[in-house]
UniProtKB/Swiss-Prot annotation:
EC number annotated for this UniProt entry: 2.1.3.15
Stored PROSITE patterns: COA_CT_NTER (PS50980)
Subcellular location: Plastid, Chloroplast stroma
Protein name in UniProt: Acetyl-coenzyme A carboxylase carboxyl transferase subunit beta, chloroplastic
GO cellular component: acetyl-CoA carboxylase complex; chloroplast stroma
Similarity comment: family membership: Belongs to the AccD/PCCB family.
Coarse class of the protein's main subcellular location: plastid
Cofactor: Zn(2+)
Catalytic activity field: N(6)-carboxybiotinyl-L-lysyl-[protein] + acetyl-CoA = N(6)-biotinyl-L-lysyl-[protein] + malonyl-CoA
Pfam families the UniProt entry points to: Carboxyl_trans
Residues the entry annotates as binding Zn(2+): 51, 54, 70, 73
Role according to the record: Component of the acetyl coenzyme A carboxylase (ACC) complex. Biotin carboxylase (BC) catalyzes the carboxylation of biotin on its carrier protein (BCCP) and then the CO(2) group is transferred by the transcarboxylase to acetyl-CoA to form malonyl-CoA.
Transmembrane domains' residue ranges: none
Amino acid sequence: MSIKEWFEDKRKITALLKNSVERDSKDANETEKNKNKSIDYAKIKKLWAQCDNCENLLYLRFLRENQSVCKECGYYLQMNSSDRIELLIDRDTWRPMDEDMYTLDVLQFYSENEPSHSDNLNSEDESYKDHITFYQIETGLTDAIQTGIGQLNGLTIALGVMDFQFMGGSMGSVVGEKITRLIERATAESLPLIMVCASGGARMQEGSFSLMQMAKIASALYIHQKEKKLLYISILTSPTTGGVTASFGMLGDIIIAEPKAYIAFAGKRVIEQTLGQKVIEDFQVTEHLFGHGLFDLIVPRNLLKGVLSELFWFYVLRSSL
Protein backbone atom coordinates (compact mmCIF):
# COMPACT_ATOMS: atom_id res chain seq x y z
CA MET A 1 0.00 0.00 0.00
CA SER A 2 1.36 3.40 -0.99
CA ILE A 3 1.51 6.34 1.42
CA LYS A 4 -1.17 8.06 -0.66
CA GLU A 5 -3.54 5.06 -0.33
CA TRP A 6 -2.82 4.82 3.41
CA PHE A 7 -3.79 8.49 3.96
CA GLU A 8 -6.91 8.00 1.78
CA ASP A 9 -8.05 4.99 3.87
CA LYS A 10 -7.38 6.90 7.09
CA ARG A 11 -9.47 9.83 5.84
CA LYS A 12 -12.40 7.51 5.03
CA ILE A 13 -12.23 5.81 8.44
CA THR A 14 -12.14 9.20 10.21
CA ALA A 15 -15.17 10.33 8.21
CA LEU A 16 -17.09 7.16 9.10
CA LEU A 17 -16.27 7.53 12.80
CA LYS A 18 -17.35 11.19 12.72
CA ASN A 19 -20.68 10.28 11.09
CA SER A 20 -21.21 7.53 13.66
CA VAL A 21 -20.59 9.93 16.56
CA GLU A 22 -22.92 12.52 15.03
CA ARG A 23 -25.60 9.88 14.51
CA ASP A 24 -25.28 8.63 18.11
CA SER A 25 -25.44 12.21 19.35
CA LYS A 26 -28.54 12.85 17.26
CA ASP A 27 -30.20 9.67 18.57
CA ALA A 28 -29.38 10.70 22.14
CA ASN A 29 -30.90 14.13 21.54
CA GLU A 30 -34.05 12.54 20.08
CA THR A 31 -34.30 10.24 23.08
CA GLU A 32 -33.93 13.19 25.45
CA LYS A 33 -36.58 15.13 23.52
CA ASN A 34 -38.98 12.19 23.68
CA LYS A 35 -38.26 11.82 27.39
CA ASN A 36 -39.00 15.50 27.95
CA LYS A 37 -42.21 15.18 25.95
CA SER A 38 -43.22 12.22 28.10
CA ILE A 39 -42.47 14.17 31.27
CA ASP A 40 -44.44 17.15 29.97
CA TYR A 41 -47.37 14.91 29.08
CA ALA A 42 -47.32 13.39 32.56
CA LYS A 43 -47.41 16.88 34.08
CA ILE A 44 -50.25 17.92 31.77
CA LYS A 45 -52.24 14.80 32.64
CA LYS A 46 -52.10 15.74 36.33
CA LEU A 47 -53.43 19.23 35.63
CA TRP A 48 -55.84 18.86 32.72
CA ALA A 49 -58.53 16.50 31.42
CA GLN A 50 -60.31 16.38 28.08
CA CYS A 51 -64.08 16.17 27.79
CA ASP A 52 -65.09 12.96 26.01
CA ASN A 53 -68.01 14.77 24.38
CA CYS A 54 -66.90 18.27 23.28
CA GLU A 55 -63.12 17.57 23.55
CA ASN A 56 -62.48 20.81 25.43
CA LEU A 57 -59.54 20.88 27.85
CA LEU A 58 -60.69 21.18 31.45
CA TYR A 59 -58.56 22.26 34.40
CA LEU A 60 -58.76 19.39 36.90
CA ARG A 61 -59.13 21.59 39.95
CA PHE A 62 -62.18 23.35 38.51
CA LEU A 63 -63.51 20.06 37.11
CA ARG A 64 -63.48 18.46 40.58
CA GLU A 65 -65.18 21.53 42.04
CA ASN A 66 -67.91 21.04 39.41
CA GLN A 67 -68.23 17.34 40.35
CA SER A 68 -66.58 16.16 37.10
CA VAL A 69 -69.25 17.74 34.90
CA CYS A 70 -68.01 19.62 31.82
CA LYS A 71 -68.92 23.32 32.11
CA GLU A 72 -68.85 23.70 28.33
CA CYS A 73 -71.36 21.02 27.32
CA GLY A 74 -72.67 19.53 30.60
CA TYR A 75 -71.25 16.08 29.86
CA TYR A 76 -70.74 13.77 32.85
CA LEU A 77 -67.13 12.60 33.04
CA GLN A 78 -66.20 9.54 35.07
CA MET A 79 -65.51 10.08 38.77
CA ASN A 80 -63.10 7.97 40.76
CA SER A 81 -64.32 6.25 43.91
CA SER A 82 -62.61 8.68 46.30
CA ASP A 83 -64.32 11.68 44.69
CA ARG A 84 -67.66 9.87 44.88
CA ILE A 85 -67.20 9.20 48.58
CA GLU A 86 -66.32 12.86 49.14
CA LEU A 87 -69.46 13.85 47.21
CA LEU A 88 -71.83 11.70 49.27
CA ILE A 89 -70.34 11.28 52.76
CA ASP A 90 -70.11 13.93 55.48
CA ARG A 91 -66.59 15.14 56.24
CA ASP A 92 -64.57 13.01 58.72
CA THR A 93 -67.25 10.31 59.05
CA TRP A 94 -65.95 7.75 56.52
CA ARG A 95 -64.73 4.45 57.99
CA PRO A 96 -63.41 2.15 55.24
CA MET A 97 -63.72 -1.63 55.37
CA ASP A 98 -61.49 -4.49 54.18
CA GLU A 99 -58.71 -2.30 52.78
CA ASP A 100 -56.20 -5.11 53.28
CA MET A 101 -57.98 -7.53 50.93
CA TYR A 102 -55.89 -8.40 47.85
CA THR A 103 -56.56 -10.38 44.70
CA LEU A 104 -54.81 -13.73 44.15
CA ASP A 105 -54.17 -15.15 40.70
CA VAL A 106 -55.88 -18.44 41.49
CA LEU A 107 -56.20 -19.51 37.85
CA GLN A 108 -52.66 -18.40 36.93
CA PHE A 109 -54.32 -16.45 34.12
CA TYR A 110 -52.00 -15.55 31.29
CA SER A 111 -52.65 -13.78 27.97
CA GLU A 112 -50.13 -12.99 25.26
CA ASN A 113 -52.64 -10.87 23.37
CA GLU A 114 -53.53 -8.35 26.05
CA PRO A 115 -52.27 -4.84 25.20
CA SER A 116 -49.77 -3.08 27.43
CA HIS A 117 -50.98 -0.24 29.63
CA SER A 118 -47.73 1.56 30.31
CA ASP A 119 -43.99 1.50 29.82
CA ASN A 120 -43.84 -0.58 33.00
CA LEU A 121 -45.90 -3.26 31.28
CA ASN A 122 -44.44 -3.46 27.80
CA SER A 123 -44.06 -7.21 27.57
CA GLU A 124 -46.36 -9.51 25.64
CA ASP A 125 -46.03 -11.92 28.55
CA GLU A 126 -48.06 -9.90 31.08
CA SER A 127 -49.78 -11.97 33.75
CA TYR A 128 -52.99 -11.12 35.58
CA LYS A 129 -50.85 -10.35 38.63
CA ASP A 130 -48.86 -7.80 36.58
CA HIS A 131 -52.07 -6.03 35.57
CA ILE A 132 -53.36 -5.96 39.14
CA THR A 133 -50.06 -4.50 40.38
CA PHE A 134 -50.08 -1.85 37.67
CA TYR A 135 -53.59 -0.65 38.54
CA GLN A 136 -52.84 -0.71 42.26
CA ILE A 137 -49.92 1.66 41.66
CA GLU A 138 -51.90 3.77 39.18
CA THR A 139 -55.01 4.25 41.35
CA GLY A 140 -53.77 3.73 44.91
CA LEU A 141 -56.53 1.13 45.44
CA THR A 142 -56.24 -2.57 46.19
CA ASP A 143 -59.10 -3.42 43.81
CA ALA A 144 -62.02 -1.92 41.88
CA ILE A 145 -64.19 -0.92 44.84
CA GLN A 146 -64.15 0.98 48.11
CA THR A 147 -66.57 0.00 50.87
CA GLY A 148 -67.26 1.43 54.28
CA ILE A 149 -69.59 3.07 56.78
CA GLY A 150 -70.23 6.81 56.87
CA GLN A 151 -72.82 9.48 57.45
CA LEU A 152 -74.97 11.12 54.81
CA ASN A 153 -76.37 14.37 56.24
CA GLY A 154 -76.13 12.87 59.71
CA LEU A 155 -77.65 9.47 58.91
CA THR A 156 -75.33 6.44 59.17
CA ILE A 157 -75.26 4.35 55.98
CA ALA A 158 -73.26 1.53 54.39
CA LEU A 159 -71.71 2.56 51.07
CA GLY A 160 -69.89 0.75 48.28
CA VAL A 161 -68.38 2.68 45.36
CA MET A 162 -66.96 0.95 42.30
CA ASP A 163 -64.00 2.53 40.49
CA PHE A 164 -63.92 2.21 36.69
CA GLN A 165 -60.28 3.35 36.62
CA PHE A 166 -59.24 0.02 38.17
CA MET A 167 -59.43 -2.57 35.36
CA GLY A 168 -62.66 -1.08 34.07
CA GLY A 169 -64.38 -1.60 37.41
CA SER A 170 -64.52 -5.32 36.68
CA MET A 171 -65.93 -7.57 39.38
CA GLY A 172 -63.60 -10.28 40.62
CA SER A 173 -63.47 -12.30 43.82
CA VAL A 174 -62.20 -9.40 45.96
CA VAL A 175 -64.85 -6.98 44.68
CA GLY A 176 -67.56 -9.57 45.27
CA GLU A 177 -66.31 -10.44 48.75
CA LYS A 178 -66.05 -6.78 49.80
CA ILE A 179 -69.59 -6.09 48.60
CA THR A 180 -70.92 -9.20 50.37
CA ARG A 181 -69.22 -8.25 53.64
CA LEU A 182 -70.59 -4.71 53.34
CA ILE A 183 -74.13 -6.03 52.85
CA GLU A 184 -73.78 -8.44 55.77
CA ARG A 185 -72.57 -5.65 58.06
CA ALA A 186 -75.38 -3.35 56.92
CA THR A 187 -77.83 -6.17 57.66
CA ALA A 188 -76.33 -6.90 61.08
CA GLU A 189 -76.38 -3.21 62.08
CA SER A 190 -79.75 -2.45 60.39
CA LEU A 191 -78.20 0.18 58.12
CA PRO A 192 -79.53 1.38 54.78
CA LEU A 193 -77.24 0.46 51.89
CA ILE A 194 -76.04 2.34 48.79
CA MET A 195 -74.08 0.81 45.92
CA VAL A 196 -72.60 3.13 43.27
CA CYS A 197 -72.03 1.03 40.15
CA ALA A 198 -69.45 1.70 37.41
CA SER A 199 -68.25 -1.49 35.79
CA GLY A 200 -67.54 -3.38 32.61
CA GLY A 201 -68.90 -6.55 34.23
CA ALA A 202 -67.38 -9.76 35.53
CA ARG A 203 -63.57 -10.05 35.43
CA MET A 204 -62.69 -12.63 32.77
CA GLN A 205 -59.27 -13.39 34.29
CA GLU A 206 -60.99 -15.07 37.26
CA GLY A 207 -63.43 -17.19 35.26
CA SER A 208 -66.15 -18.88 37.34
CA PHE A 209 -64.81 -17.30 40.54
CA SER A 210 -65.92 -13.97 39.10
CA LEU A 211 -69.35 -15.17 37.92
CA MET A 212 -69.99 -16.75 41.33
CA GLN A 213 -69.93 -13.28 42.91
CA MET A 214 -73.21 -12.40 41.18
CA ALA A 215 -75.12 -15.14 43.01
CA LYS A 216 -73.27 -14.56 46.29
CA ILE A 217 -74.11 -10.85 46.34
CA ALA A 218 -77.73 -11.49 45.32
CA SER A 219 -78.10 -13.98 48.18
CA ALA A 220 -76.78 -11.45 50.72
CA LEU A 221 -79.14 -8.81 49.32
CA TYR A 222 -82.10 -11.18 49.64
CA ILE A 223 -81.54 -11.39 53.39
CA HIS A 224 -80.99 -7.62 53.66
CA GLN A 225 -84.06 -6.64 51.65
CA LYS A 226 -86.62 -9.44 51.94
CA GLU A 227 -85.98 -10.93 55.36
CA LYS A 228 -84.78 -7.88 57.31
CA LYS A 229 -86.84 -5.32 55.30
CA LEU A 230 -83.87 -2.94 55.01
CA LEU A 231 -83.43 -0.37 52.26
CA TYR A 232 -81.01 -0.80 49.37
CA ILE A 233 -80.50 1.98 46.81
CA SER A 234 -78.58 1.27 43.61
CA ILE A 235 -76.95 4.17 41.73
CA LEU A 236 -75.99 3.42 38.12
CA THR A 237 -73.29 5.56 36.52
CA SER A 238 -71.62 5.42 33.13
CA PRO A 239 -70.75 2.75 32.22
CA THR A 240 -72.58 -0.01 34.07
CA THR A 241 -72.63 -3.22 32.04
CA GLY A 242 -72.36 -7.00 32.08
CA GLY A 243 -72.56 -9.00 35.29
CA VAL A 244 -72.96 -5.93 37.51
CA THR A 245 -76.07 -4.85 35.58
CA ALA A 246 -77.33 -8.43 35.69
CA SER A 247 -76.95 -8.70 39.46
CA PHE A 248 -76.87 -6.08 42.23
CA GLY A 249 -77.06 -3.12 39.84
CA MET A 250 -80.72 -3.83 39.12
CA LEU A 251 -81.73 -5.25 42.50
CA GLY A 252 -82.19 -1.95 44.34
CA ASP A 253 -85.44 -1.09 46.10
CA ILE A 254 -84.86 2.25 44.43
CA ILE A 255 -82.72 2.45 41.29
CA ILE A 256 -81.18 5.84 40.46
CA ALA A 257 -79.26 6.61 37.27
CA GLU A 258 -77.09 9.55 36.28
CA PRO A 259 -78.08 11.57 33.18
CA LYS A 260 -76.90 10.22 29.81
CA ALA A 261 -75.17 7.21 31.39
CA TYR A 262 -74.44 4.11 29.32
CA ILE A 263 -76.18 1.17 31.00
CA ALA A 264 -76.43 -2.25 29.39
CA PHE A 265 -75.92 -5.96 29.73
CA ALA A 266 -74.41 -6.69 26.31
CA GLY A 267 -73.03 -4.11 23.89
CA LYS A 268 -74.86 -2.80 20.81
CA ARG A 269 -72.70 -4.77 18.37
CA VAL A 270 -73.22 -8.05 20.24
CA ILE A 271 -76.99 -7.53 20.28
CA GLU A 272 -77.08 -6.73 16.56
CA GLN A 273 -75.03 -9.81 15.72
CA THR A 274 -77.21 -12.02 17.93
CA LEU A 275 -80.55 -10.70 16.65
CA GLY A 276 -79.38 -10.22 13.09
CA GLN A 277 -80.92 -6.74 12.91
CA LYS A 278 -80.04 -3.12 13.61
CA VAL A 279 -81.05 -1.45 16.87
CA ILE A 280 -81.74 2.24 17.39
CA GLU A 281 -79.04 4.66 18.52
CA ASP A 282 -78.82 5.56 22.21
CA PHE A 283 -81.17 2.73 23.21
CA GLN A 284 -78.82 1.94 26.12
CA VAL A 285 -78.68 5.50 27.44
CA THR A 286 -80.35 6.49 30.73
CA GLU A 287 -83.14 8.62 29.27
CA HIS A 288 -84.30 5.94 26.82
CA LEU A 289 -84.20 3.21 29.47
CA PHE A 290 -86.02 5.42 31.97
CA GLY A 291 -88.81 5.88 29.42
CA HIS A 292 -89.22 2.10 29.38
CA GLY A 293 -89.43 1.78 33.16
CA LEU A 294 -85.99 0.44 34.06
CA PHE A 295 -85.17 3.12 36.66
CA ASP A 296 -87.03 5.04 39.33
CA LEU A 297 -85.12 8.33 39.15
CA ILE A 298 -82.63 10.24 37.02
CA VAL A 299 -80.69 12.51 39.39
CA PRO A 300 -77.93 15.02 38.48
CA ARG A 301 -74.76 14.81 40.57
CA ASN A 302 -75.19 18.16 42.25
CA LEU A 303 -78.59 17.06 43.62
CA LEU A 304 -77.75 13.45 44.46
CA LYS A 305 -76.81 13.83 48.12
CA GLY A 306 -79.92 15.88 48.86
CA VAL A 307 -82.21 13.40 47.08
CA LEU A 308 -80.65 10.44 48.91
CA SER A 309 -81.00 12.26 52.23
CA GLU A 310 -84.72 12.85 51.66
CA LEU A 311 -85.27 9.22 50.65
CA PHE A 312 -83.43 7.92 53.71
CA TRP A 313 -85.18 10.19 56.18
CA PHE A 314 -88.54 9.26 54.67
CA TYR A 315 -87.55 5.60 55.08
CA VAL A 316 -86.49 6.17 58.71
CA LEU A 317 -89.75 7.94 59.54
CA ARG A 318 -91.84 5.23 57.88
CA SER A 319 -89.90 2.51 59.71
CA SER A 320 -90.57 4.15 63.08
CA LEU A 321 -94.35 4.14 62.61
